[in-house]
Swiss-Prot record:
Component of the class I major histocompatibility complex (MHC). Involved in the presentation of peptide antigens to the immune system. The keyword Ribosomal protein does not apply. GO terms for biological process: antigen processing and presentation of peptide antigen via MHC class I; immune response. It comes from Sigmodon hispidus (Hispid cotton rat). Heterodimer of an alpha chain and a beta chain. Beta-2-microglobulin is the beta-chain of major histocompatibility complex class I molecules. This is Beta-2-microglobulin. Residues 25-114 form the Ig-like C1-type domain. SUPFAM superfamilies: Immunoglobulin. It holds the Pfam family C1-set.
Amino acid sequence: MARTVATFFLMLVSLACLDAIERPPQVQVYTRHPPENGKTNFLNCYVSQFHPPHIEIELLKNGKKIEKVEMSDLSFSKDWTFYLLAHTEFTPTANDKYACRVSHVTLKEPKVVTWERDM
């Protein structure tokens, strides 16, 4: 009986420690297909390795929020950090600038990662 209580107590302590871990998100912005001006494509913002799970992700066109953005389900990795994919259909042009803005408790201000079309 004492062993069961001790095991249960250790599990509770472990779970409490998981909530104390904070990791900032890693952000990658890329397209599904090689970009061509005037040709429809998908813009992706992959956010990973963050904890706790609450996060805000926005895709931006010329600094303004894109309204029609889809999100994958929140998932977690083996190390209990989380990852999420935000994506939208878009048609790139030579003049438009695209970015992903991420807000998370570990960041003092939102992290903005610009899409580099030559990568």
